[in-house]
């Protein structure tokens, strides 16, 4: 029992929320991800959209719960990007006409049209990551888990991906679980959970957690716009923390 990383661990994530899970190395972030997808067994129980995570419901869970890991190479098994998108859908029982339509839609959203017939090995790291995320979303799952996935994207692709994730959250009620060590990525989430040695030491809205220097005292590097906002609050130039530079500029020079 003393070897358990997680003890008396309870976590509930609301439907269509965007939750960031952060923590230093060894905090349990990636272990939690592996537990959530059934790679590690856990005592107690895990339910996903009302289904117990076990052999009986694993097929149903795979349809509603998509996962994208840091190593995008694990998503590629076909000779082309198109092959891999087809494989994602074939696995879930889609017919040819449905697959063609869904691939067309997702490739336009993620700007993949020019690389659909490329070999995955010829893609940049950012392109590979973008394809992996697109592949995870192509069948419109209810839940998407991103485990240290975003950091390989270029700044341009990050903006596109986060824009699309927010659209999926709003329009398709997608629940997003983002595991990251980069606090810049948490600016798009609604709720931030801090892990330390397998325990939740903080669980607050983005607005609450960035009100003070708690995360900085814990050794995290705050996002630039948060640090800027906090400094401007000290001089009574802002009334609260803002999460985009445009918002800060508009408040300072309306």
Q: Language model features by range: what are they?
A:
Residues 22-24:
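The feature captures the beta-strand-to-loop junction immediately N-terminal to the Walker
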């Amino acid at each position: 029992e003393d070897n358990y990383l997680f003890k008396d661990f309870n976590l509930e994530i609301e439907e269509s929320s965007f939750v960031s899970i952060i923590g230093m190395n060894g905090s349990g972030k990636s272990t939690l991800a592996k537990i959530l997808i059934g790679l590690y067994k856990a005592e107690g129980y895990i339910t996903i959209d009302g289904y117990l995570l076990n052999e009986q419901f694993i097929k149903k869970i795979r349809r509603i719960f998509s996962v994208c890991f840091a190593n995008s190479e694990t998503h590629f098994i076909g000779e082309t990007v198109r092959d891999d998108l087809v494989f994602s859908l074939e696995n879930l029982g889609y017919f040819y006409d449905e697959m063609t339509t869904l691939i067309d839609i997702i490739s336009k959203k993620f700007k993949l049209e020019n690389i659909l017939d490329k070999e995955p090995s010829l893609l940049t790291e950012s392109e590979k990551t973008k394809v992996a995320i697109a592949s995870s979303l192509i069948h419109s799952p209810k839940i998407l888990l991103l485990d240290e996935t975003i950091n390989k994207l270029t700044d341009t692709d990050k903006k596109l991906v986060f824009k699309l994730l927010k659209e999926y959250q709003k329009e398709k009620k997608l629940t997003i679980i983002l595991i990251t060590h980069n606090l810049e990525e948490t600016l798009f989430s609604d709720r931030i959970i801090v892990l330390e040695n397998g325990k939740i030491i903080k669980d607050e809205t983005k607005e609450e957690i960035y009100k003070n220097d708690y995360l900085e005292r814990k050794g995290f590097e705050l996002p630039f716009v948060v640090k800027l906002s906090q400094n401007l609050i000290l001089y009574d130039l802002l009334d609260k923390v803002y999460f985009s530079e445009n918002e800060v500029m508009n408040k300072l020079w309306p």
